[in-house]
């Protein structure tokens, strides 16, 4: 009886190659983070620049801080497009983010302009420590009380690193 080892060896070689390539590319990890803090706003006509500073906790980097600079435009209420960079920093590293097109903040209504919900996606633009090679896009959502300056934020997604 003849045995055909060729196909078996080929399948084994392909399986080993797939494992090696997967390891070389890096791993994917679910990422979650929650932050809260205070926003400082500068309004110039319909242009708004917000500077959030907060504390919280992110998977992979631990307890730490959130900082950023967010640009918005209030000329088309009740929603405003958002853009700008941000940074999450913890004892195990730093993650740099950039808000993507489609990110927005919306007031609850014309009679409640200080009650603002915001959401969108942020692209990872760099990192340090355990997230030095991080890539991916995170979804974020949160609430901002324009009257008090208080905000809370949640980020979720999958990072390749």
Task: Describe the predicted segments one by one.
Residues 1-10:
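Bacterial N-terminal signal peptides that target proteins for export
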Residues 25-161:
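Beta-strand-enriched cores of mature, soluble protein domains
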Residues 9-20:
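Bacterial N-terminal signal peptides
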């Amino acid at each position: 009886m003849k045995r055909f080892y060729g196909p078996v060896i080929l399948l084994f070689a392909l399986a080993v190659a797939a494992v090696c390539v997967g390891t070389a590319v890096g791993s994917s990890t679910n990422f979650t983070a929650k932050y809260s803090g205070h926003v400082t706003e500068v309004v110039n006509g319909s242009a708004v620049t917000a500077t959030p500073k907060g504390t919280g906790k992110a998977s992979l980097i631990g307890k730490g801080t959130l900082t950023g600079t967010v640009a918005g435009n209030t000329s088309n209420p009740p929603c405003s497009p958002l853009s700008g960079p941000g940074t999450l920093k913890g004892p195990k590293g730093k993650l740099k983010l950039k808000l993507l097109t489609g990110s927005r903040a919306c007031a609850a209504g014309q009679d409640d302009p200080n009650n603002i919900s915001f959401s969108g996606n942020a692209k990872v633009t760099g990192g340090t420590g355990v997230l030095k090679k991080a890539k991916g896009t995170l979804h974020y959502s949160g609430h901002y009380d324009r009257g008090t300056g208080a905000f809370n934020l949640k980020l979720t997604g999958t990072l390749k690193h």
